[in-house]
Amino acid sequence: MARPLRKKYRPWNPAAYAQLRYAPADRLPEGDLVFFLLDLVPRLDLSRFYASYEVETRGAPPFDPALLVCLLLYAYCVGVFSSRKIAAACERNLAFLAIVGDDRPDFRTISDFRKEHLDLFADVFTEVLGIAAEAG
């Protein structure tokens, strides 16, 4: 996946979270869905998600769209749909923590991202299902 070079995003590096002393992923069972998504999301074409941020140059760096896509995909897969419940899970649930690490989005960030990119998620879900079918 090609990332735009102009815009600076808050860093998202799930592999680095595994190096932490308290790595949440270490406590998850092998084969957990979150590992599949952490491997899958960087391979998705998220260029349209990034494009919407390229025009805005003011303010602090936004969350990496890949983090928010991964977070929402996982939340939907496990039946968590409310942005407030997703944000709460990012504080307590090991699988959610494996995605967000120490940089946890609040409910408004999650909600705004979902609203702003709702039309793009149908393509992402289709792409994920295709890759999952290939993987078996």
Describe each PLM feature range.
Residues 1-136:
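Detector for conserved single-position "signature" residues within domains
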